[in-house]
Swiss-Prot record:
Homodimer. Pathway: Cofactor biosynthesis; tetrahydrofolate biosynthesis; 5,6,7,8-tetrahydrofolate from 7,8-dihydrofolate: step 1/1. One of its GO terms (cellular component) is mitochondrion. Keywords: Methyltransferase, Multifunctional enzyme, NADP, Nucleotide biosynthesis, One-carbon metabolism, Oxidoreductase, Transferase. NADP(+) binds at residues 25-31, 93-95, 114-117, 155-162. It catalyses: (6S)-5,6,7,8-tetrahydrofolate + NADP(+) = 7,8-dihydrofolate + NADPH + H(+); dUMP + (6R)-5,10-methylene-5,6,7,8-tetrahydrofolate = 7,8-dihydrofolate + dTMP. InterPro entries: DHFR, DHFR-like_dom_sf, DHFR_CS, DHFR_dom. The keyword NADP applies. Its EC number is 1.5.1.3, 2.1.1.45. Residues 1-182 form the DHFR domain. The keyword Transport does not apply. This is Bifunctional dihydrofolate reductase-thymidylate synthase. In the N-terminal section; belongs to the dihydrofolate reductase family. In the C-terminal section; belongs to the thymidylate synthase family.
Length: 182
């Protein structure tokens, strides 16, 4: 399952709950437009870190079936070996850069950065398990060869938009901040 970080009941509602105003309000100058809400951050960590070992086999079977039906080619070059069952978080370069250094990479999650310009050698050595991809299409072969529980798309706006436009998001976790920020 690819999830974005309000459960949406049908695919028509997915697109309608995110308008152009929503995408303009997701970030501000590489950060959040509002002060950090510790309750929301704890919820984000909880949702994106939670793994149910007992449910993994069922999810893996569904994924393998999808990948086989869609004839996805798998190349494991440059993909780190990960033994512990974790979730994947996919983010754009600006979202990655907005994370304070002390929290990078996001703990207990497989971090994947979607960027056309960022290169692996530009990352600090302590980020050796971070995966960099240039396009959404590069994500699918990685999903085939990594042991993971769920894949979360965590931003920014253009990354959300691309996954939504391609109808790749199954579930949306949505926090509404009822205020205007400039």
């Amino acid at each position: 399952a690819i999830c974005a970080c309000c459960k949406v009941l049908n695919s028509n509602e997915k697109a309608s709950c995110f308008s152009n105003k929503t995408f303009k309000g997701l970030g501000n100058a590489g950060g959040l437009p509002w002060k950090c809400n510790s309750v929301d951050m704890k919820h984000f960590v909880s949702v994106t870190s939670y793994v149910n070992e007992n449910n993994y086999i069922r999810l893996k079977w569904k994924r393998d079936k999808y990948i086989k039906e869609n004839n996805v080619k798998v190349n494991t070059d440059g993909i780190p070996s990960i033994d512990k069952l974790q979730n994947i978080v996919v983010m754009g370069k600006t979202s990655w850069e907005s994370i304070p250094s002390k929290f990078k990479p996001l703990e207990n999650r497989i971090n994947i950065i979607l960027s056309r310009t960022l290169k692996k050698e530009n990352l600090a050595k302590e980020y050796s398990n971070v995966i960099i991809i240039k396009s959404v299409d590069e994500l699918f072969p990685i999903l085939k060869c990594i042991k993971y529980y769920k894949c979360f798309i965590i931003g920014g706006a253009s990354v959300y938009k691309e996954f939504l436009d391609r109808n790749l998001i199954k579930k949306i976790y949505f926090t509404r901040i009822n205020n205007a920020y400039t």
